[in-house]
Curated annotation (Swiss-Prot):
The lineage of its organism: Eukaryota, Metazoa, Chordata, Craniata, Vertebrata. This is Alpha-enolase. Gene3D superfamilies: Enolase-like C-terminal domain (3.20.20.120), Enolase-like, N-terminal domain (3.30.390.10). Mg(2+) 1 binds at residue 40. Binds two Mg(2+) per subunit. Required for catalysis and for stabilizing the dimer. There is a cross-link at residue 202 (Glycyl lysine isopeptide (Lys-Gly) (interchain with G-Cter in SUMO2)). It comes from Pongo abelii (Sumatran orangutan).
Length: 434
C-alpha cells in the first residue's frame, strides 16, 4: 500500500526541547513516529538539523527539518507510490535526495522520522507486529526479549553533580523472563533511593534526564558501592550485574583524562589512558561490572584496543562507532571494542540501523539498543531490540514516562508471545548462540 500523505510537526522531547514528529497516512490508517535527541553528541554522527534561530527555543527549533519533510520529502514519496513495506527503497531514496555524507541537507532527524513511520506502516500493511516486521527486514527468524540495563545513577553531562562517569547501570541477568527483570530493576531502584536518602539526604534523590539519581558524589567508586549495597538490600546479589557508560570523550583533555572535569580546570590532576584503564580493572575486580561503554575518547584508538584485549568484559562503542558502518568496520579491524551501541538517530534511518547491527553481529560483537537522553513517548526501539535479537537494551531507569513507555511495550510484547517468548538472560551478549 502506498503512502497517501505525510505531515511533520514540531513537538517536545523529555527535556522541553523541540523535536520532529511525523504522521504518515496509508489506506490502513495513521502511523506516527517521533525522533529522540542526545546530550553528548559524537562528532562522527549524522547531523541533527536545528534552526539555530536564537530568538526561538534558544536556537534549538526544528522547523527547518519539519519543512524539509513537508515540502520536499513528503511530495517525493507520495508521488513515487512506493509500498510502505519497501523500507530499504524508501530510505535509499531519502538518503539520495539529501545527497550529503551526514544527512546535513534535510537533517537526520527529518529522514529518521519518516523512516520510523514507514516501518510502523509496513508492519500493519503486512498484518504483523512491528517487532516481527523488523525481524523480517533483518532476516531473523527468531525474536528475543532483551535484558534491560537500567541507568540508576547519573553523572557526566547528564547530571549537575561532580561525578565524571555518565551512567551506572544494573542488569538483572538472572531473571527468568522480562517481567521478572522489570520487577528486580524496580525493587533495586527503590532500595537505591532509600540508601541514597539515608546517606546523602532527601535532595540527593532528585532524578536526572534518564530517571536515575544524581547524588553529589565525586568518586566513581562510590557510585558502584551504592549499587552494590542496593542490590544486596533488595536480595538480588546473585541475579544483578553492573554496567557503566563512562562517556570519556566528555572529559578527554589533550591526550589525558580529567575525572574532576566539572571543577575549575587543573591539568596537574589529569590521568593517562593506562591509569584510567587500571581504574576500570579495579572496578571489574571489586564489583560485578560486566560492561563498560565509551571507556576512552572517540579517537583514542590505541587505548580502546589495549583495554578490550585485556579486560575480559563487554566493551561497548558508542561515541567510538556512532552506529556508523564505516566506523564499525574500522573498530572491527582494530579490535577496539566488542559491542555496538545502536542508536537509530546517530545514523538516521531504519535501514542503516539494521545494516550496522548486522555488521556488528556478523563480526561476533554484541549489540545494545539504546534510547537518547532527550526522549519522547515513541516506543519504536522496544520492538527494534526484540526483532534484532540483540539481547540488551538501555532506556533509562524505571522512572519517567518516556523511559517506561519502552519498558512497558516490552512487557506487552512478552505477554503477546506467551509461551514462545525467549528472554536473553545471562546470554545477553550473544543471545542467538545455540
Amino acid at each position: 500500500m502506498s503512502i497517501l500523505k505525510i505531515h511533520a510537526r514540531e513537538i517536545f522531547d523529555s527535556r522541553g526541547n523541540p523535536t520532529v514528529e511525523v504522521d504518515l497516512f496509508t489506506s490502513k490508517g495513521l502511523f506516527r513516529a517521533a525522533v529522540p535527541s542526545g546530550a553528548s553528541t559524537g562528532i562522527y554522527e549524522a547531523l541533527e538539523l536545528r534552526d539555530n534561530d536564537k530568538t526561538r527555543y534558544m536556537g534549538k527549533g526544528v522547523s527547518k527539518a519539519v519543512e524539509h519533510i513537508n515540502k520536499t520529502i513528503a511530495p517525493a514519496l507520495v508521488s513515487k507510490k512506493l509500498n510502505v513495506t519497501e523500507q530499504e527503497k524508501i530510505d535509499k531514496l531519502m538518503i539520495e535526495m539529501d545527497g550529503t555524507e551526514n544527512k546535513s541537507k534535510f537533517g537526520a532527524n527529518a529522514i529518521l522520522g519518516v523512516s520510523l513511520a514507514v516501518c510502523k506502516a509496513g508492519a500493519v500493511e503486512k498484518g504483523v507486529p512491528l517487532y516481527r516486521h523488523i525481524a523480517d527486514l533483518a532476516g531473523n527468524s527468531e525474536v528475543i526479549l532483551p535484558v534491560p540495563a537500567f541507568n540508576v545513577i547519573n553523572g557526566g553531562s547528564h547530571a549537575g553533580n561532580k561525578l565524571a562517569m555518565q551512567e551506572f547501570m544494573i542488569l538483572p541477568v538472572g531473571a527468568a523472563n522480562f517481567r521478572e527483570a522489570m520487577r528486580i530493576g524496580a525493587e533495586v531502584y527503590h532500595n537505591l533511593k532509600n540508601v541514597i536518602k539515608e546517606k546523602y539526604g532527601k535532595d540527593a534523590t532528585n532524578v536526572g534526564d534518564e530517571g536515575g539519581f544524581a547524588p553529589n558524589i565525586l568518586e566513581n567508586k562510590e557510585g558502584l558501592e551504592l549499587l552494590k549495597t542496593a542490590i544486596g538490600k533488595a536480595g538480588y546479589t546473585d541475579k544483578v550485574v553492573i554496567g557503566m557508560d563512562v562517556a570519556a570523550s566528555e572529559f578527554f583533555r589533550s591526550g589525558k583524562y580529567d575525572l574532576d572535569f566539572k571543577s575549575p580546570d587543573d591539568p596537574s590532576r589529569y590521568i593517562s589512558p593506562d591509569q584510567l584503564a587500571d581504574l576500570y580493572k579495579s572496578f571489574i575486580k571489586d564489583y560485578p561490572v560486566v560492561s563498560i561503554e565509551d571507556p576512552f575518547d572517540q579517537d583514542d584508538w590505541g587505548a580502546w584496543q589495549k583495554f578490550t584485549a585485556s579486560a575480559g568484559i563487554q566493551v561497548v562503542g558508542d561515541d567510538l562507532t556512532v552506529t556508523n558502518p564505516k566506523r564499525i568496520a574500522k573498530a572491527v579491524n582494530e579490535k577496539s571494542c566488542n559491542c555496538l551501541l545502536l542508536k537509530v538517530n546517530r545514523i538516521g534511518s531504519v535501514t542503516e540501523s539494521l545494516q550496522a547491527c548486522k555488521l556488528a553481529q556478523a563480526n561476533g560483537w554484541g549489540v545494545m539498543v539504546s534510547h537518547r537522553s532527550g526522549e519522547t513517548e515513541d516506543t519504536f526501539i522496544a520492538d527494534l531490540v526484540v526483532g534484532l535479537c540483540t539481547g540488551q537494551i538501555k532506556t533509562g531507569a524505571p522512572c519517567r514516562s518516556e523511559r517506561l513507555a519502552k519498558y512497558n511495550q516490552l512487557l506487552r510484547i512478552e505477554e503477546e508471545l506467551g509461551s514462545k517468548a525467549k528472554f536473553a538472560g545471562r546470554n545477553f551478549r550473544n543471545p542467538l548462540a545455540k
